[in-house]
Amino acid sequence: MPNPTVKTITDVGIDLDGVMYPFVDAFREYCSIHMPDGKFPEPQQWNFYRDWGIEDDTFHRWLYEGAQSHNLFSTHYPMQGSYLAWELLRKLKVRIHVMTARPTTAWKQTADWLHHHYLVPDNLYFTSKKSMLAHVATGTAMAIEDHVDYYEDLKGAGVLTVLYNQPWNIAHPNSPRVSNLVEFAQLVEQINNREIPCLQTALVSSTQPQNL
């Protein structure tokens, strides 16, 4: 009988904000325009802006306005490891799908930013239904996320999924974790080289919990 663990990763899904793009830093800079005396501590929860004294409605309004007036989604460089990871994934000949739930005001900026930094994916999806990766993949898919809801959604769809270690997901139990995109690409390489079984449980045992 064929061994179900002997598979090759053909497609990867990569989140943007908090994985490739330092959105919190960009939004902090924008908030300082409106709140010059504000305090902006490092995020400890997904809705980090609440710790900055910003209401939900204000956050969404500034998200819209900042994208139009200050290129909120394209002002910063890619996060550590993005370039090296991209190079390794291309060498592995996997299809790269960038998947983000960014608002419509960010769509053009996002595409331009990826091209400007030579991080051009095979596909770019703007969606909150990231489990679609399971349906567009040509074979076995693997993904990286920093939002626990998307992580669970992907995992539930049968996608091998890794959490990008962030304060807002640190308490999520039994989750494989990486500290940068290079580590994710190396996991893909190890699976495709048959060094790690192609199983979610194997990913958990192959990555160590990281304290922030």
Regions found by a protein language model. Name each.
Residues A101-K155:
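Substrate-recognition "cap/lid" segment bordering the active-site pocket of phosphatases
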Residues M142-S179:
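Acidic, Mg2+-coordinating phosphoryl-transfer loop and its flanking beta/alpha structural elements
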Residues L124-S128, P176-E183:
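Short acidic-hydrophobic, aromatic-tinged amphipathic segments that line or gate anion-handling sites
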Residues Q68-V98, T104-Q109:
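Short, acidic loop-to-helix structural element flanking the phosphoryl-transfer center
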Residues P2-R61, H172:
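Active-site neighborhood of HAD-like aspartate-dependent phosphohydrolases
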Residues L133-T138, F184-L199:
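Short amphipathic alpha-helix with an adjacent loop that forms part of the alpha/beta core around
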